[in-house]
Curated annotation (Swiss-Prot):
GO biological process terms, semicolon-separated: cell wall organization; peptidoglycan biosynthetic process; regulation of cell shape; response to antibiotic
GO molecular-function term, one example from the UniProt record: undecaprenyl-diphosphatase activity
Disulphide linkage map: none
UniProt-listed InterPro entries: UppP (IPR003824)
Protein name: Undecaprenyl-diphosphatase
Locations listed in the record: Cell inner membrane
Name of the gene: uppP
The protein's enzyme class: hydrolase
Membrane topology reported for the UniProt record: Multi-pass membrane protein
Catalytic activity: di-trans,octa-cis-undecaprenyl diphosphate + H2O = di-trans,octa-cis-undecaprenyl phosphate + phosphate + H(+)
Primary residence: membrane
Record keywords, A-Z: Antibiotic resistance, Cell inner membrane, Cell membrane, Cell shape, Cell wall biogenesis/degradation, Hydrolase, Membrane, Peptidoglycan synthesis, Transmembrane, Transmembrane helix
Further remark: Bacitracin is thought to be involved in the inhibition of peptidoglycan synthesis by sequestering undecaprenyl diphosphate, thereby reducing the pool of lipid carrier available.
Transmembrane segments: 1-21, 39-59, 83-103, 111-131, 149-169, 183-203, 218-238, 246-266
């Protein structure tokens, strides 16, 4: 990988991991335009680690509070808002794990094409618009409850389909279930931690077993750039949606999907 490819792909990963705009849709464009080969598992792990570090550091106070409360709920039987939120995030992760292990190969075989990505980018963008329009804006993430958390987790499992956007579909589900915009985004971001960590661990296992060649310079640069982009993305996204809602991202998704359709089929 040359330096330009590392920079572009790392920034795309960092920005699109948490924006509701689909990383898959953005990653196919530079590959098609510049004729780049697959960046490899090692680079994927590096940029995922950068994104993971960004969300963990940004929400470090909330994560520490949840971890302490979660341990207290296990060993002392003490329940609190933080311990409940931790349990709900764990519960919301289960559907993605189940679907990931059972349907990953099928999705890779039948739903990985650029046409699917273009269409799902538009469809799930419209669904996000609908959710934002009907959102009741009532609850914080601490009022979610286990049933709503599980439903958001089921929605997260749909993100296995390329073009869906993990953050987009989970925020959509959370809005439909009554969470405030900022609360929906925060819950989605906290949900991403076990998912990104799990994906990175699985890819690391494949790297070890398949003896991949590692370009440490590309990995270090990719990880750092992904971290910076992801952290900035989280910060500004939470501020934007509090004032403007999801409309800018819906418009962008639809425009991108239409452009991809034209790029692919015309």
């Amino acid at each position: 990988m040359d330096t330009l490819q590392v920079i572009i792909l790392a920034l795309i990963q960092g920005l699109t991991e948490f924006l509701p705009i689909s990383s898959s849709a953005h990653l196919i464009l530079p590959a098609q335009l510049f004729g780049w080969e697959d960046q490899g598992l090692s680079f994927d792990v590096a940029v995922h680690i950068g994104s993971l570090a960004a969300v963990v550091i940004y929400f470090r106070n909330e994560i520490l509070a949840m971890l302490k409360a979660w341990l207290a709920s296990i060993f002392r039987g003490q329940q609190s808002d933080d311990s409940k939120l931790a349990w709900w995030i764990i519960l919301a992760t289960i559907p993605a794990i189940g679907v990931g292990f059972t349907a990953k190969d099928m999705v890779e075989t039948h739903l990985r094409g650029p046409g699917v990505i273009a269409i799902t980018t538009v469809i799930f963008g419209l669904l996000l618009w609908f959710a934002d329009r009907i959102a009741k804006d009532e609850m914080t993430e601490y009022q979610t409850g286990w049933r709503k958390a599980l439903l958001i987790g089921v929605a997260q499992a749909l993100a296995l389909i390329p073009g869906t956007s993990r953050s987009g579909i989970t925020i959509t589900a959370a809005l439909m279930l009554g969470l405030k915009r900022e609360a929906a985004a925060r819950f989605s971001f906290l949900m991403s931690i076990p998912v990104i960590l799990g994906a990175a661990l699985l890819m690391t296992k494949d790297i070890i077993t398949e003896n991949h060649v590692v370009d440490w310079h590309a990995l270090a640069l990719g990880s750092i750039l992904s971290f910076i982009a992801a952290y900035a993305c989280i910060y500004f996204f939470l501020k934007i949606i509090s004032r403007m809602g999801m409309t800018p991202f819906v418009i962008y998704r639809i425009a991108l999907g239409v452009f991809l359709c034209g790029f692919i089929y015309l």
